[in-house]
């Protein structure tokens, strides 16, 4: 299947690539089906792309690329909702706010997107750990999360 994206042209994807968000995402509750694709020539950022609205693509990254000790503690209810059986089924992404000044590019460490890669379902959650910033600068000299 093909999808025309706003910023990255045509993306090929398969049915098995679709991630279902039962409740959508905050601000996009009406959107339920997404794919994640890598940005060419960039090994940090990916895009969480809506299949229902081609103009909606959210930059994301793995928090572990900038914060090796990042920790997500899911509640029993979240584990149940996402049908998680093991850590190996979990993919964690964080949204990114892009800025023309690279020093101002931030990620939201407080509200990760949790994806069960086996069941292809996802949910954005809010962590209780207030040490994780909502606007954490990605490109800083010291990465202390």
Curated annotation (Swiss-Prot):
Acts as an anti-CsrA protein, binds CsrA and prevents it from repressing translation of its target genes, one of which is flagellin. Binds to flagellin and participates in the assembly of the flagellum. This is Flagellar assembly factor FliW. GO terms for biological process: bacterial-type flagellum assembly; regulation of translation. SUPFAM superfamilies: BH3618-like (SSF141457). It comes from Clostridium tetani (strain Massachusetts / E88). The keyword Nucleus does not apply. Interacts with translational regulator CsrA and flagellin(s). Its main location: cytoplasm. One of its GO terms (cellular component) is cytoplasm. Transmembrane segments: none annotated. Belongs to the FliW family. NCBIfam families: PRK13285.1-1 (NF009793). InterPro entries: Flagellar_assembly_factor_FliW (IPR003775), Flagellar_assmbl_FliW_dom_sf (IPR024046). It is found in: Cytoplasm. It comes from the Bacteria. Gene3D superfamilies: BH3618-like. Keywords: Bacterial flagellum biogenesis, Chaperone, Cytoplasm, Translation regulation.
């Amino acid at each position: 299947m093909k999808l025309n994206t706003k910023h990255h042209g045509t993306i090929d994807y398969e049915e098995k690539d679709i991630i279902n968000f039962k409740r959508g995402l905050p601000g996009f509750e009406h959107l339920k089906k997404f794919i994640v694709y890598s940005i060419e020539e960039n090994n940090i950022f990916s895009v969480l792309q809506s299949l229902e609205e081609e103009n909606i693509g959210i930059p994301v990254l793995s928090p572990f690329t900038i914060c090796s000790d990042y920790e997500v503690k899911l509640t029993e209810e979240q584990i149940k909702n996402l049908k998680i059986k093991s850590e190996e089924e979990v993919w964690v992404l964080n949204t990114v706010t892009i800025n023309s000044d690279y020093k101002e590019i931030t990620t939201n460490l407080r509200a990760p997107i949790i994806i069960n890669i086996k069941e292809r379902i996802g949910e954005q959650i809010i962590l209780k750990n207030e040490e994780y910033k909502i606007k954490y600068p990605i490109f800083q000299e010291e990465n202390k999360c």
